[in-house]
Amino acid sequence: MIAWRLPLCVLLVAAVESHLGALGPKNVSQKDAEFERTYADDVNSELVNIYTFNHTVTRNRTEGVRVSVNVLNKQKGAPLLFVVRQKEAVVSFQVPLILRGLYQRKYLYQKVERTLCQPPTKNESEIQFFYVDVSTLSPVNTTYQLRVNRVDNFVLRTGELFTFNTTAAQPQYFKYEFPDGVDSVIVKVTSKKAFPCSVISIQDVLCPVYDLDNNVAFIGMYQTMTKKAAITVQRKDFPSNSFYVVVVVKTEDQACGGSLPFYPFVEDEPVDQGHRQKTLSVLVSQAVTSEAYVGGMLFCLGIFLSFYLLTVLLACWENWRQRKKTLLVAIDRACPESGHPRVLADSFPGSAPYEGYNYGSFENGSGSTDGLVESTGSGDLSYSYQDRSFDPVGARPRLDSMSSVEEDDYDTLTDIDSDKNVIRTKQYLCVADLARKDKRVLRKKYQIYFWNIATIAVFYALPVVQLVITYQTVVNVTGNQDICYYNFLCAHPLGNLSAFNNILSNLGYILLGLLFLLIILQREINHNRALLRNDLYALECGIPKHFGLFYAMGTALMMEGLLSACYHVCPNYTNFQFDTSFMYMIAGLCMLKLYQKRHPDINASAYSAYACLAIVIFFSVLGVVFGKGNTAFWIVFSVIHIISTLLLSTQLYYMGRWKLDSGIFRRILHVLYTDCIRQCSGPLYTDRMVLLVMGNIINWSLAAYGLIMRPNDFASYLLAIGICNLLLYFAFYIIMKLRSGERIKLIPLLCIVCTSVVWGFALFFFFQGLSTWQKTPAESREHNRDCILLDFFDDHDIWHFLSSIAMFGSFLVLLTLDDDLDTVQRDKIYVF
């Protein structure tokens, strides 16, 4: 059995040797080589050249070695293969080097340089050998040049700027060792020109080093770069207390926002990219210390806790002032029957006998508007309270009856004999005309705003938190820092968070939102106590006190802080709506609160209000996903925007006393015929018409701007629409308040002035634009800037500080704006 197998084995061995002899080289040329010397040799399929190098490696001294190769023959199909064999690593590359780009495009490089990874040594000094093997399958001679150099400045030093050149086929990397006492550094790389696009990578000191465009993303942290790049590196992430800074030029510029180069139509024809060289400078500087973290947190807490202290001091002062005032009134006007001062009907100046339920009318006490129209025609209409006589409050029936507080009672007027269509369509209305419903009914109605937004907040925030944690985990695991748009020059990590300072600065929204809730709670407690003791000022005077919307506003401010912090965990275009969703809520709630002040009975319900805000957020998401450059989307949105503006204008103008049904067009034509064609009559509600005309002009202009310009940041565009409408309504409210003879007390006036100033500074810092996800990550980093406050906070953090204070101040303005009316009867307070 063995006898016949032996000849077969001999034949197989002979065949293999014959095959290897046919494929393998005939000659091997080995020579000792020296550093800093250029070797020009030839190689073909019959010859392999081996160069032997040796150098002394010292344990406490790191030295870089760089191999440079240039193939002089431009031939296709048979590249040269260079293999560098070291003690613990092997590096191989072909020349011409072919790297692939987008759509598998091929780019050819005749000159290649690679830095060798130095293996560590345990001895004080050691002579190490490495070999460079050169081979090819080309049957003809191929001429090449080989040179091995020692790299000067291979080890980067803290605070020293180093400049170098690199290309896609000549990547560079350098070593940095953490000095004693330094736990964190920031690696800054800059260039005077944006292109060619490059990649900055931070890798552990291991072999091999991934320093080509097609493998640089395999390990470590990396980010694309045009003119700026910055990566914060912590000692705890590198057990060897050192790392490599790798710089690679990409084959194409599309990742950095550039255009694709011309590509030949010949299939598989590589493009020579030898001209893509970039000059860069690298600087490693110490990052902030733990003391800076503590100082930043104490500063942030100190600023906002000072508002708590100021609020307590103001509350104590106001309490002392009220006690003093009450004591003086008690001395001057003590009532012997009750033994303590109490506001009576005749204590209101200018009161007249009560004449039934038409207390919203003027002068004659009737429900007719003839007198008003007549006065208007003569130009003698006055907006001051002193020129009108009103009914006494004491003789008026209580509006907070013990009737049912079911949902069906929300839109009933059982406490009057007049039809609400008559009351609400009078030419001139007073707050008493629109504050006729049961107080408990309205309280329940407006409390729904708070409970609904609390529910929305929970269901919205939990998935958001989960998602941004996933984003941060992906960044930490993959090392791809292009996922998140930080200000990398001022991004201070803490734990797993990459930019803790941007998250910390959102604390103001939460703390000031909570403070606003506490202020509202105190006001509500005081108001309820006044109601319990039948204080007629609380019962019959001033703007009706409903606190549900204020609670909703405070909750929205807190949620804005939470969601803004979530957005800044990993800011990018896919989660920007997290940062803006509750801004829409705040803008909408503020407008509703302004409207509720003078229209408590007919304000929108929480369900319809939040449904409208949900539609806004829905369009925000659609705009982010589909709106960029999509003409059809912008046409549809602009049409919906204009139609919604017209419908809302009609609702506000007619105080809800109109119907959207099949007869709407017939009624419109009838109004146009009677008021414009038969006789030219002006609008019945002039003030409302002025506001709505201005609002329509602004909204139509914004719709036209969006349709023509089609801004990339749709979420901010949508927010701008809400803010413009809020500012317009707020300005109209203040103007009409002053025009009606009312005044603004000192505290709200100070709030208005201070808030306006703070908003101005806040917007200045907001428009600094430290990053933008409307561009590529590399282009966004061109806007990055160093910290400007305590070496810990950047411009956007200051925007967070100031905008939270400004929002809090704006809420206080809404809360205190009508405090001057607390002693004015509601049938003397105009509706506008």
From Swiss-Prot:
Protein role: Mediates the translocation of RNA and DNA across the lysosomal membrane during RNA and DNA autophagy (RDA), a process in which RNA or DNA is directly imported into lysosomes in an ATP-dependent manner, and degraded. Involved in the uptake of single-stranded oligonucleotides by living cells, a process called gymnosis. In vitro, mediates the uptake of linear DNA more efficiently than that of circular DNA, but exhibits similar uptake efficacy toward RNA and DNA. Binds long double-stranded RNA (dsRNA) (500 - 700 base pairs), but not dsRNA shorter than 100 bp.
The name this protein goes by in its record: SID1 transmembrane family member 2
UniProtKB keywords: Cell membrane, DNA-binding, Glycoprotein, Lysosome, Membrane, Phosphoprotein, RNA-binding, Signal, Transmembrane, Transmembrane helix, Transport
Changes after translation: Glycosylated.
Molecular functions (GO terms): AP-1 adaptor complex binding; AP-2 adaptor complex binding; DNA binding; double-stranded RNA binding; nucleic acid transmembrane transporter activity; RNA transmembrane transporter activity
Cited InterPro entries: SID1_TM_fam
Family: Belongs to the SID1 family.
Tissues with expression: Highly expressed in the liver, brain, kidney and intestine (at protein level).
UniProt cross-references to Pfam families, sorted A to Z: SID-1_RNA_chan (PF13965)
Segments in the Extracellular topological domain: 16-293, 469-499, 568-605, 653-688, 737-746, 818-832
Top-rank lineage group of the source organism: Eukaryota
Cytoplasmic side: 315-447, 521-546, 627-631, 710-715, 768-796
Signal peptide: 1-15
Biological source species: Rattus norvegicus (Rat)
GO biological process entries: cell morphogenesis; glucose homeostasis; regulation of insulin secretion involved in cellular response to glucose stimulus; response to glucose; RNA catabolic process; RNA transport; type B pancreatic cell development; type B pancreatic cell proliferation
Keyword Protease listed: no
Glycosylation sites: N27, N54, N60, N123, N141, N165, N476, N496, N572, N603
Compartments where found: Lysosome membrane; Cell membrane
Main localization category: membrane
Gene (name only): Sidt2
Modified residues (Phosphoserine): S401, S403, S404
